[in-house]
C-alpha cells in the first residue's frame, strides 16, 4: 500500500524495482519497459500472477502470492548489471508458459506432442512447471534426451489424470512438480549425467503415482464424473488416439451427456421402466430414481464429444430427437474409436438404455486404462 492508501500490485512493485536498477540509463530503462510489456502483456495477459510464481519455483522453490515481491526483490531483481539478462530469461519462459496455456504444440507427429496435448486436455495448470522445463531442455536436444522428456511428460499426465478422476483436487502436485521441473532444468549442467538425472525425475514421478495408487477400470467404470472437465479429459485420451500424425487436434470440442443432466420426464419414464412402478413414486422410490439418474448421466458410458454449437442445440432433448442431429455433424463417440462396427456405438443403436450405458462404460474403461498407462 502506498502513501495514499492505495494497494499496489506486486507486479507493479517488481517493475518499479527493475526500473530502479536501471538508474539514470535511459536506454536501459526503455529496454526494461519493452521487455516488461512483451512478457506481461503480450505473452501472458491476465495469467501473469501464476507465471511469476511458477517461474520462481523453477529457479528456487514454490512460493505463495504473498511472497512474490519479497522473493523477486531478494533473488531475481537484486543486481543492476544482470537485470536485462534476467528479464530476457523471464521472457523466454513466458513463451513456454503461453504455449502450455494455449495448447500450441503443433501436429500429433510425435509421442512428445501427444503427451503435451493429453496434459492440456486436463484443463489444469499445475503441470506447467514441468511443461516449461521440458520445452526449455527439448530445444535442439539429442534424440535420446527427447525420449526421456517424453517419458516424463507421460508420467506427469498419469499423475494429473489419476488425481482428477479420483477427486483428489486439481492442484495436489502444485508444490511437487516444481521440484521435479527444477531437476529437469539442472540436468543440462553435465551432459554426461543428464540422462541419469532425467531417469531419477521419471522414477520420482512413478513413485508418486504408486503412493496415490494408479487408476483401475473400476475407478473409471463406476466414477460419477460430475465435473465436465474430468470426463472431457478422459474422452480426449481416446480422441487424440484417432487424430492423424500430420493434423493438429481440435481443442474446442465440448462434453455432451447423451442422457442430459436435466432430462425431460418422458425420457426418464422410458429409461426407468426397469426401476419398477408408475408415478406417483414414493419418497424412497424417488431417491432411488434420482440416484440412478446420476449413475447414468455422469457415467463415462454416457459421454461423447462434439462442437459447442451442436452441444447447445441438442441440449435436453431425448435420444430419439438427438440422434438425427448427431448424425448431421462431427461427433466423437469413444466406442467408435475402439471399433467402427461395435454394436454399442451411438450410430448403431436405436435406444439409449441403462444397460447400454453400463456396457459402454466397461468397454471404454478397459481401453482407457491401456491407453493411459501404455
Which stretches of residues belong to each language-model region?
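Flexible coil/loop and intrinsically disordered segments
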Residues: 1-374
Amino acid at each position: 500500500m502506498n502513501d495514499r492508501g492505495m494497494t499496489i500490485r506486486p507486479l507493479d512493485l517488481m517493475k518499479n524495482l527493475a526500473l530502479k536498477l536501471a538508474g539514470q540509463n535511459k536506454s536501459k530503462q526503455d529496454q526494461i519497459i519493452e521487455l516488461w510489456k512483451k512478457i506481461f502483456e503480450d505473452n501472458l495477459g491476465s495469467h501473469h500472477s501464476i507465471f511469476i510464481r511458477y517461474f520462481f519455483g523453477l529457479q528456487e522453490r514454490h512460493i505463495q502470492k504473498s511472497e512474490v515481491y519479497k522473493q523477486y526483490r531478494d533473488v531475481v531483481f537484486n543486481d543492476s548489471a544482470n537485470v536485462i539478462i534476467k528479464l530476457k530469461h523471464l521472457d523466454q519462459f513466458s513463451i513456454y508458459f503461453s504455449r502450455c496455456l494455449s495448447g500450441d504444440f503443433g501436429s500429433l507427429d510425435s509421442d512428445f506432442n501427444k503427451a503435451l496435448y493429453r496434459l492440456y486436455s486436463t484443463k489444469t495448470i499445475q503441470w506447467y512447471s514441468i511443461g516449461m522445463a521440458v520445452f526449455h531442455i527439448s530445444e535442439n536436444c539429442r534424440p535420446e534426451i527427447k525420449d526421456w522428456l517424453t517419458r516424463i511428460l507421460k508420467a506427469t499426465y498419469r499423475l494429473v489424470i489419476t488425481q482428477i478422476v479420483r477427486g483428489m483436487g486439481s492442484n495436489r502436485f502444485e508444490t511437487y512438480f516444481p521440484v521435479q521441473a527444477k531437476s529437469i532444468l539442472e540436468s543440462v549442467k553435465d551432459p554426461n549425467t543428464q540422462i541419469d538425472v532425467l531417469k531419477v525425475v521419471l522414477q520420482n514421478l512413478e513413485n508418486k503415482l504408486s503412493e496415490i495408487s494408479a487408476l483401475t477400470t473400476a475407478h473409471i467404470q463406476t466414477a460419477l464424473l460430475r465435473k465436465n472437465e474430468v470426463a472431457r479429459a478422459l474422452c480426449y485420451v481416446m480422441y487424440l488416439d484417432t487424430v492423424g500424425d500430420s493434423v493438429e487436434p481440435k481443442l474446442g470440442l465440448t462434453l455432451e451427456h447423451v442422457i442430459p443432466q436435466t432430462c425431460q420426464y418422458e425420457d426418464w419414464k422410458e429409461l426407468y421402466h426397469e426401476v419398477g412402478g408408475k408415478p406417483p413414486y414414493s419418497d424412497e422410490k424417488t431417491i432411488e430414481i434420482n440416484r440412478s439418474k446420476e449413475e447414468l448421466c455422469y457415467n463415462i458410458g454416457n459421454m461423447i464429444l462434439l462442437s459447442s454449437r451442436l452441444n447447445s442445440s441438442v441440449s435436453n432433448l431425448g435420444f430419439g430427437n438427438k440422434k438425427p442431429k448427431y448424425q448431421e455433424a462431427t461427433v466423437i463417440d469413444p466406442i467408435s474409436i475402439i471399433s467402427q462396427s461395435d454394436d454399442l456405438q451411438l450410430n448403431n443403436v436405436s435406444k439409449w438404455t441403462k444397460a447400454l450405458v453400463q456396457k459402454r462404460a466397461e468397454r471404454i474403461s478397459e481401453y482407457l486404462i491401456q491407453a493411459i498407462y501404455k
